[in-house]
Amino acid sequence: MATVPGQLIWEIVKRNNCFLVKQFGRGNAKVQFSKESNNLVNINSYKHSGLANKKTVTIQAAGKDQGVVLGTTKTKRQNKPKLSVNKSILKKEFSRMSKVVANQVVDNYYRPDLKKAALARLSAISKGLRVAKSGPKRRNRQA
């Protein structure tokens, strides 16, 4: 079965797909966002599109106390999207998770252009999963 090139797929889906969110920015400028699962920065562009690129990276929360899921797509099973995702759960502290994400994204020239976006998404998700410390409240000593 012949595969369709990513450039052609992007030309077909860039203006009309179910993940597209169009909003007005400042003035009359339209801003287009994307709700794709494999889009790290949620911007409607060819570089970040999970539909048009064969190699995609996704970082999601696994649950409250379960850590972060790092997903990369296999390039061989493009016609079976559910089977084409490698998922690994990261449960360590942030510094180790950031090393793993950086190595996975840049390793073997997978998608080195997405390293900064992947680390930013990991940082945002890990901050959201962090639990606030409970302890005695500090009192103001000026009273």
From Swiss-Prot:
One of its GO terms (biological process) is translation. The keyword Repressor does not apply. The keyword Ribosomal protein applies. Keywords: Ribonucleoprotein, Ribosomal protein. PANTHER family: 60S RIBOSOMAL PROTEIN L28. The gene is RPL28C. GO terms for cellular component: cytosolic large ribosomal subunit; plasma membrane; plasmodesma. Belongs to the eukaryotic ribosomal protein eL28 family. It holds the Pfam family Ribosomal_L28e. This is Large ribosomal subunit protein eL28y. GO terms for molecular function: mRNA binding; structural constituent of ribosome; transcription cis-regulatory region binding.
